[in-house]
């Protein structure tokens, strides 16, 4: 029987062979959908308190480069990656890879764009580097490993985001195989991010810090810095340390069965993905119920929903994004659960608060976070129920380009106005030479 290639060696080989890979139009289209989504959620968060704070700190560091903060000046690539990576996750509205790695595009595109600007790389090179970084993160988080980390209290997006960022940077910096191995080692020894931070500014910071740490790892490797090269395989490495009972390990041969990018998911709602099935179900029921006549609400949800999105009494808009009761209450009240619905005004709406108080979570063992139901018990004794076997935005029930354009417009028009449509069209044709400079010129004016 053929002996499995060590995971670390397979990852290094996958990164090193990036220039030789030719991607199909389908794959490039998927990468560009990630890019459009990334710009939409990042630009929409330009005034978010977390984004503003991180930008102020990064700007205070002083040294400049050629990489731009969104709506800001040219700074070092590390500073741009930190600021832009944080912005991309401030609204918790960014794409999600449900195999276990979480929000991959946030740190990955932040690094790809920063280094492409800094080093004059082409749009095609940036796309190729992003795809490689995305695959590294998605494959390391697959096989139940990422989900196990989440149950253990770790934020997979933060952990695997460092590897996607390091891989993307390694490609754009032209690292050799030895340097790539060291870069992955440095990225691995910096992993972190706790689920206990969900509902606070620290959660989006996880992704900005992952972007910066991954880029730093590659920069250090290029400068001759050496690190452990066995962290993806050794018992005292990534899986053995973070899952100490050995119940789940990194999947062997993780780069041999097509591209995980084609299984990415996108959010129609500006809240934790684990709430979306219940939002879908609630919106189905909204036209059939009068909120004031609801006596009791049962939310059928996955164990993961209970683990990460079950805040029973949210007090801030950020907490609301991780409260399936609040998100379902929005849906039942006829709201679309877009970013504007996660506001202090909406959160304090007495009718919405009344629905939250009437809600209870019924965990459905063995179900995925993409499925759920809402059951409404009315004061007249009637019961209404809507089941959602697969929430909108996931593979099998995907978001269309039309849906993505509507999401993008809703986020960007308040910021860019008439420039929104030209920006969208430019991103859709991102592989065209000269597009990167054109795009960044549109989104780097100061506000």
Where are these regions (language model features)?
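Buried hydrophobic packing segments
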Residues: 39, 108-115, 130-137, 162-170, ...
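Function-dense linear segments that define catalytic or interfacial modules
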Residues: 82-95, 104-122, 129, 136, ...
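Terminal-appendage/accessory-domain detector
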Residues: 1-102, 195-212, 219-447
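Hydrophobic alpha-helix position signal
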Residues: 58, 116, 169-170, 412
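Short connector loops/turns at beta-strand edges and beta->alpha or beta->beta junctions
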Residues: 88, 107-109, 114, 136, ...
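Glycine-rich, mobile lid/loop segments that gate access to catalytic sites or pores
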Residues: 117-120, 124-216, 230, 235
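Conserved, well-structured ligand/cofactor-binding cores
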Residues: 73-76, 97-105, 109, 118-131, ...
């Amino acid at each position: 029987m053929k002996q499995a290639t060590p995971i670390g060696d397979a990852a290094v080989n996958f990164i090193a062979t990036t220039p030789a890979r030719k991607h199909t139009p389908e794959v490039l289209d998927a990468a560009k959908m990630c890019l459009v989504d990334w710009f939409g959620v990042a630009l929409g968060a330009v005034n978010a308190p977390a984004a503003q704070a991180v930008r102020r700190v990064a700007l205070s560091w002083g040294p400049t480069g050629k990489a731009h903060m969104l709506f800001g000046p040219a700074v070092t690539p590390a500073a741009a990656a930190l600021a832009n990576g944080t912005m991309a996750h401030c609204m918790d509205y960014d794409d999600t890879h449900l195999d276990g790695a979480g929000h991959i595009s946030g740190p990955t595109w932040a690094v790809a764009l920063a280094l492409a600007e800094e080093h004059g790389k082409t749009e095609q090179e940036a796309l190729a580097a992003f795809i490689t970084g995305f695959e590294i993160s998605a494959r390391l988080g697959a096989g139940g490993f990422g989900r196990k980390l989440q149950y253990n209290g770790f934020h997979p997006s933060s952990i695997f985001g460092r590897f996607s960022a390091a891989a993307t940077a390694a490609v754009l910096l032209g690292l050799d195989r030895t340097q790539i191995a060291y870069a992955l080692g440095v990225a691995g020894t910096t992993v972190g991010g706790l689920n206990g931070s969900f509902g606070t500014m620290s959660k989006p910071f996880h992704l900005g810090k992952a972007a910066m740490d991954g880029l730093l790892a590659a920069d250090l490797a290029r400068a001759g810095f050496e690190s452990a090269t066995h962290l993806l395989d050794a018992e005292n490495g990534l899986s053995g340390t973070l899952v100490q009972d050995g119940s789940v390990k990194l999947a062997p041969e993780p780069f041999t069965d097509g591209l995980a990018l084609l299984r990415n998911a996108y959010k129609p709602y500006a809240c934790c993905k684990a709430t979306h099935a219940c939002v879908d179900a609630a919106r189905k029921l909204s036209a059939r119920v009068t909120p004031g006549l609801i006596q009791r609400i049962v939310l059928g949800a996955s164990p993961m929903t209970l683990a990460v999105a079950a805040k029973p009494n949210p007090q801030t808009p950020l907490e609301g994004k991780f409260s399936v009761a609040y998100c379902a209450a929005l849906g039942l009240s006829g709201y679309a659960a877009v970013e504007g619905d996660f506001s202090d005004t909406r959160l304090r709406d007495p009718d919405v608060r009344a629905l939250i108080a009437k809600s209870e979570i019924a965990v459905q063992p063995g179900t995925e976070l993409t499925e759920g139901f809402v059951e409404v018990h009315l004061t007249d004794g009637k019961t209404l129920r809507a089941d959602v076997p697969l929430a909108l935005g996931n593979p099998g029930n995907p978001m269309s380009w039309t849906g993505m354009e509507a999401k993008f417009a809703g986020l960007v028009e308040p910021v860019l106005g008439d420039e929104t449509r030209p920006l969208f069209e430019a991103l859709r044709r991102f592989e065209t030479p000269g597009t990167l400079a054109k795009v960044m010129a549109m989104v780097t004016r100061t506000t």
